[in-house]
Amino acid sequence: FFTVRDILQRYRAEDVRYFILASHYRSPLNYSQENLEHGKAALTRLYTALRGIEPAAAGGDAGDAWVTAFNAAMDDDFNTPEAIAVLFELAREINRQRDSDPGRARALVTCLLALGSTLGLLQSDPDAYLREGGDPDAISEADIETLIENRLQAREEKNWAEADRIRDELEAAGVVLEDGPAGTTWRRS
């Protein structure tokens, strides 16, 4: 037995919303922690595509094909699983365009945010979503930042064993590090 309050102590409301929308409204909804974790992981993939790209001021026609596909899914007996599949196709295209055509990527981000908002998804700041864990016992942001600084110091000193140990410690605490040209970013797994 569980209550919505119990679920919301462990998962964000948006994770639960995604979990519900991922099933067609005429189909039975199979509640399980595993299915909620799948929903949380799926939202993490969408937010990861949005991370680091500001939306364009005006979307233009860059996302027209996805808007058409999304609307067709919604017009097909409110087929939210198919509409969500369109969001993932759009996220994949954003990831492909991220470096090669940043202007198009920004326009596609605008489209993804608009389509996601239709379903009540993708309403949070991507960095904030990816840094929140939902687990009250999780390692704090301050501790994560301190460990990242220690890791960067170890890397500067070419102390690879220490840098790897810190990465492993963060990974064990449910934190994923992403090293890039702009520095190290992190998100909760």
Identify the residue ranges that each predicted region occupies.
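Structural preference for alpha-helix termini/caps and helix-kink/transition segments
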Residues: 1-189
